[in-house]
């Protein structure tokens, strides 16, 4: 997930992509098959399209990663397309407020009754991933 404003997305895109790559790498190193999105969800259209595309792959678990602030409705749109278990994962970084975005998304998903779990911390720590 990423910020929906184009001028902010440009500034955080590389950070968000690097964080996603690190998470995917850690999961793959542990033997998990990772089905990645085509990029950060930063518009309503992308959230809906990617949510449907990933749901069609029928993953055992869908992880919404929040490396930076993200508008909660992106999570609601993507979650609407997914049917399996959902994990909201946020980094804790003073420069990039990913946890704030994850908490906002979690509240939005609670409001629509979409079950999910939440995890947060330094993604480089084994206790987090």
Model-derived regions, located:
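An N-terminal assembly and electron-transfer interface module characteristic of large anaerobic redox
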Residues: 1-129
